[in-house]
């Protein structure tokens, strides 16, 4: 396989994002829409899997994350929606100027499609682990742990550091304050930002989305069980949504959870299914 290209994406508001292009022959591109606080390197093995089958893949670190973060997150001014409307949009634009684009999303990636300036530029999207985020959809005791994160650990951590120190709570990368505030507010609502009158500027765009979307969740995903997925994807009223329930035993693993979709244990069976689903909408697999 061709060596990945480390590139810089320029957003519409002038921010510079670290990104990686896994090159393949031809003009087919998959853009990976990362989960909240997850650096692009986490998706490397899936990107290499698709690249080996003749598909270009683009991954990026959103602003404030991974190689796109400033020297300090304290005082870093941004909103959660910037990751979708500006950062993911820059990755899609990069791919769209070079060929046809499909999207593979993880968690936030399912929320981001409807926030893109023009989601209909995508041929189709397959997203994993995207749900409404409300703790009430989660099984016990996860709902109590998440409630404690928002109402106890989060407020203490943000007061101490000026950002959300997720890494100190075993939860991945630290999050900018603007991301924490928006995420906390929307996760308090059963249908996420669709229940927030102040988010109307975001949610109104979802009705414009008319692409096919595969919305896959594992039945053991504590953060995005099927009911949570269904609550959120009602917002894509004019898209063709294919709700896909995955069983860990069907993938030959004991656990998938919220992060296992892009780990190689489950990926051995899941990734071919993902590309096969996208193939219904024009993606062609070839040996790179």
Residue ranges and their predicted role:
Residues 27, 32-38:
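Active-site glycine-rich loops that stabilize anionic/oxyanionic intermediates
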Residues 242-288:
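Catalytic active-site module of serine/aspartate enzymes centered on a nucleophile-bearing elbow/loop
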Residues 40-73:
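Conserved alpha/beta-hydrolase
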Residues 77-96:
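Alpha/beta-hydrolase active-site loop
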Residues 224-235:
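Short alpha-helix in the alpha/beta-hydrolase fold that links the catalytic acid
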Residues 209, 215-217:
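Short beta-strand/loop motif that positions the catalytic acidic residue
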Residues 1-22:
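N-terminal cap/lid segment of alpha/beta-hydrolase-fold proteins
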Residues 104-191:
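Alpha/beta-hydrolase-fold enzymes
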């Amino acid at each position: 396989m061709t060596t990945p290209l480390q590139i810089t994406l320029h957003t519409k508001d002038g921010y510079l994002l670290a990104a990686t292009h896994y090159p393949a022959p031809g003009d087919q591109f998959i853009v990976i829409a990362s989960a909240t606080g997850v650096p692009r390197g986490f998706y490397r093995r899936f990107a290499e899997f698709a690249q080996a089958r003749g598909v270009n893949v683009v991954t990026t670190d959103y602003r404030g994350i991974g190689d796109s973060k400033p020297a300090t997150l304290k005082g870093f001014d941004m909103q959660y929606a910037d990751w979708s409307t500006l950062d993911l949009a820059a990755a899609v634009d990069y791919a769209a100027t070079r060929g046809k684009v499909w999207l593979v999303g993880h968690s936030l990636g399912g929320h981001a499609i409807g926030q893109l300036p023009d989601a209909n530029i995508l041929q189709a999207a397959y997203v994993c682990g995207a749900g409404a985020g409300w703790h009430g959809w989660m099984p016990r005791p996860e709902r109590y742990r998440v409630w404690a994160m928002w109402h106890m650990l989060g407020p203490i951590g943000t007061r101490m550091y000026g950002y959300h120190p997720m890494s100190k709570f075993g939860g991945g990368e630290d999050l900018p304050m603007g991301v924490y505030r928006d995420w906390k507010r929307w996760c308090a609502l059963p249908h996420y930002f669709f229940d927030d009158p102040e988010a109307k500027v975001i949610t109104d765009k979802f009705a414009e989305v008319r692409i096919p979307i595969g919305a896959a969740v594992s039945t053991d995903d504590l953060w995005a069980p099927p009911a949570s997925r269904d609550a959120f994807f009602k917002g894509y009223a004019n898209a063709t949504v294919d709700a896909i329930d995955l069983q860990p035993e069907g993938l030959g693993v004991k656990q998938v959870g919220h992060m296992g979709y892009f780990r190689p244990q489950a990926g051995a069976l899941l990734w071919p299914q993902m590309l096969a689903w996208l193939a219904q909408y024009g993606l062609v697999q070839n040996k790179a």
